[in-house]
Amino acid sequence: MARLVGVDLPRDKRMEVALTYIFGIGRTRSNEILAATGIDRDLRTRDLTEEQLIHLRDYIEANLKVEGDLRREVQADIRRKIEIGCYQGLRHRRGMPVRGQRTKTNARTRKGPKRTIAGKKKAR
C-alpha cells in the first residue's frame, strides 16, 4: 500500500481519487499535483513505481500544507478569532453557525440536540 505524508492510499483507486484521501487535497489540487509531476491520473495506486512515489512525496512536502500542519493552522485561526473577539470568534465560542446561516430553524448539527423548554400552562 502506497503511503504519502502519513496516509495510506487505497491500492485500487485511480491516482486522481486516491490523492484526495489526504486532508487538504481535493479533486482539483489532485489533478494539479499529477500534472506537475507528470503522472497519469488514470494510473492505479498499485501500479506506481517507487520513483513516482518519491517524486509525488517530494512535490507535496515542498509545495503544499496538508494533514497535521493544515489541521493545526485551521485550529490556530479559529483560536485567534476567538481571542480577538470578532463576530466569527463569538459564533465559534457559542457553538453556532459561523457563516451567516439561519438559526431560528435548522442548524441542529452545530447547536446540538434540542433543549425542550417548558411552555406556558393553558388557562381554563
Swiss-Prot record:
Keywords: Ribonucleoprotein, Ribosomal protein, RNA-binding, rRNA-binding, tRNA-binding. Gene3D superfamilies: 1.10.8.50, 30s ribosomal protein s13, domain 2. Residues 94-124 are annotated as: Disordered. Pfam families: Ribosomal_S13 (PF00416). One of its GO terms (molecular function) is tRNA binding. One of its GO terms (biological process) is translation. One of its GO terms (cellular component) is small ribosomal subunit. Belongs to the universal ribosomal protein uS13 family. Located at the top of the head of the 30S subunit, it contacts several helices of the 16S rRNA. In the 70S ribosome it contacts the 23S rRNA (bridge B1a) and protein L5 of the 50S subunit (bridge B1b), connecting the 2 subunits; these bridges are implicated in subunit movement. Contacts the tRNAs in the A and P-sites. Part of the 30S ribosomal subunit. Forms a loose heterodimer with protein S19. Forms two bridges to the 50S subunit in the 70S ribosome. HAMAP family: Ribosomal_uS13. NCBIfam families: uS13_bact. This is Small ribosomal subunit protein uS13. It comes from Mycobacterium tuberculosis (strain ATCC 25618 / H37Rv). The lineage of its organism: Bacteria, Bacillati, Actinomycetota, Actinomycetes, Mycobacteriales. The gene is rpsM.
